[in-house]
From Swiss-Prot, chain B:
It is a multi-pass membrane protein. PANTHER family: ATP SYNTHASE SUBUNIT A. Subunit a, of the mitochondrial membrane ATP synthase complex (F(1)F(0) ATP synthase or Complex V) that produces ATP from ADP in the presence of a proton gradient across the membrane which is generated by electron transport complexes of the respiratory chain. ATP synthase complex consist of a soluble F(1) head domain - the catalytic core - and a membrane F(1) domain - the membrane proton channel. These two domains are linked by a central stalk rotating inside the F(1) region and a stationary peripheral stalk. One of its GO terms (molecular function) is proton-transporting ATP synthase activity, rotational mechanism. This is ATP synthase F(0) complex subunit a. Component of the ATP synthase complex composed at least of ATP5F1A/subunit alpha, ATP5F1B/subunit beta, ATP5MC1/subunit c (homooctomer), MT-ATP6/subunit a, MT-ATP8/subunit 8, ATP5ME/subunit e, ATP5MF/subunit f, ATP5MG/subunit g, ATP5MK/subunit k, ATP5MJ/subunit j, ATP5F1C/subunit gamma, ATP5F1D/subunit delta, ATP5F1E/subunit epsilon, ATP5PF/subunit F6, ATP5PB/subunit b, ATP5PD/subunit d, ATP5PO/subunit OSCP. NCBIfam families: ATP_synt_6_or_A. Belongs to the ATPase A chain family. It holds the Pfam family ATP-synt_A. Keywords: ATP synthesis, CF(0), Hydrogen ion transport, Ion transport, Membrane, Mitochondrion, Mitochondrion inner membrane, Transmembrane, Transmembrane helix, Transport.
Length: 251, 227
């Protein structure tokens, strides 16, 4: 479809060739159609008509003077005037007119509402599509707000997480410290035990050495005569013991 | 006052000024330019929907080169439909009943398609003169026949439209006269004839739309062959 662009100020300035940039720059704003924005909205419905062709304004116009029947009287009078004065002559075209009029009225009455709803549906679909885009955008933005609020709530609980982590770290440090303390204690004990054992060993060795020396010296000091005397003494003691035992046994 | 039934087809003039110019310019008035709005009123919506749909349908079988003709064919269709339908109203003059107008549409447009075909793809354009699968002995005869068929196309286009509309209008006038004359004498017969007139008017409405559509469709077909 061809659109007619009406520029205000369509003067000699615009009569140049299309290559001249100056043409567009010199278009005045307050006269061009851009100054009319925003465009006032179109009326929702067309003008009211009675009987399909006579606008309601005619009836409103005549009502103060002639009442409700005024326009009808006017119409009838006009028709009869034209017929009687033979301004309009009834001929074969009248019947052709009646016939085509019947076809038109039948068509409008039968298909009018459906065509109107069809046209409305086309427009409504357009509006619905745009509305859907708008609704989706709004829904996604609202969802974004909800998500942001949730994140903020999550952030509030963050200190609990930090406390738990801090506890964990403290525990680890404590455990580590105790382990090391334990290790140190063990090491020191080991060293000290060693020293103690060493001293014990010394003492034992000294003791054994002394005992050995004493035994050696005693053994060396036992003369053979003393040895014989001790053996004889032992034998006599044994005999005495044997006797006492026998005597105890017989009693 | 009509002298003969053919006076309705005389090109009207008033004080030497031809009225046919007004009759031809009238359809333009009836289609308002869509305003620069997103949502329009019902009339503009329907008008826009119809033109879009029609042009889409018409351009379906055409390749991209043929789409250059979209504006011409769509506007031609709207023009012819409006003129034909307006001609059905009483006391109107239908410009498409004039053979001169219809030939003025048919010959240049048909010639344009032929010249486009001959210039851009002469082999294919000439190849259309021989349908596929013809038996060999028939080829010379068929070429002659196809050439005649090609050359008669503009004549057929123009005369088809003229004849259909003229015949329809004439019939309407005749039967309406019959009703008019019979009404005082034999009212019953007049009423039956009036019924016939009603049916004929319905037919004429259909013919008006169909003939315009056929004109444009055939042109698009010729274009399809050649572009």
């Amino acid at each position: 479809m061809i659109r007619k662009y009406t520029y205000g100020g369509h003067t000699l300035k615009n009569s140049g060739s299309f290559g001249a940039c100056l043409v567009q720059a010199s278009r005045s704003f307050h006269q061009s159609s851009q100054s009319l924005a925003p465009v006032p909205p179109l009326p929702e419905k067309g003008g009211k008509v009675r009987h399909g062709i006579f606008p309601e304004e005619l009836f409103t116009l005549l009502y103060p003077k002639t009442g409700v029947t005024g326009p009808y009287m006017l119409g009838t009078g006009l028709l009869l005037y034209m017929l009687s004065k033979e301004i309009y002559v009834i001929n074969h075209e009248t019947f052709a007119a009646a016939s085509i009029g019947a076809v038109v009225i039948y068509g409008v009455k039968k298909f009018g509402p459906s065509v109107a709803t069809f046209a409305d549906k086309i427009n409504e679909d357009k509006v619905a599509k745009a509305q859907e885009v708008k609704d989706q955008a709004m829904a996604s933005l609202a969802q974004g707000i909800e998500d942001e609020k949730k994140e903020q709530w999550r952030v509030e609980g963050r200190h609990m997480l930090f406390d738990a982590k801090r506890n964990n770290v403290a525990m680890l440090l404590e455990t580590n410290y105790r382990e090391r303390l334990h290790m140190v204690t063990n090491e020191v004990k080991k060293r000290l035990d060693y020293q103690v054992e060493l001293q014990n060993l010394h003492r034992r060795m000294e003791q054994e050495h002394m005992v050995n020396w004493v035994e050696q010296s005693v053994i060396k000091s036992i003369t053979p005569q003393q040895e014989k005397e001790s053996i004889a003494k032992c034998i006599s003691d044994l005999k005495v013991l044997a006797k006492t035992t026998q005597a105890r046994a017989s009693v | 006052m009509m002298v003969s039934f053919f006076d309705q087809f005389a090109s009207p003039s008033y004080l030497g000024i031809p009225n046919i110019a007004v009759a031809i310019a009238l359809p333009w008035v009836l289609y308002p330019t869509p305003p620069a709005r997103w949502i329009n009123n019902r009339l503009i919506t329907i008008q826009g929907w119809f033109i879009n749909r029609f042009t889409n349908q018409l351009m379906l079988p055409l390749n991209v080169g043929g789409h250059k003709w979209a504006l011409l064919l769509a506007s031609l269709m709207i023009f012819l439909i409006t003129i034909n339908m307006l001609g059905l109203l009483p006391y109107t003059f239908t410009p498409t009943t004039q053979l001169s107008l219809n030939m003025g549409f048919a010959v240049p447009l048909w010639l344009a398609t032929v010249i486009i075909g001959m210039r851009n793809q002469p082999t294919i354009a000439l190849g259309h003169l021989l349908p596929e699968g013809t038996p060999i002995p028939l080829i010379p005869v068929l070429i002659i026949i196809e050439t005649i068929s090609l050359l008669i196309r503009p004549l057929a286009l123009g005369v088809r439209l003229t004849a259909n509309l003229t015949a329809g209008h004439l019939l309407i006038q005749l039967i309406a006269t019959a009703v008019f004359v019979l009404l005082p004498m034999m009212p019953t017969v007049a009423i039956l004839t009036a019924a016939v007139l009603f049916l004929l008017t319905l037919l004429e409405v259909a013919v008006a739309m169909i003939q315009a559509y056929v004109f444009v469709l055939l042109l698009s077909l010729y274009l399809q062959e050649n572009v």
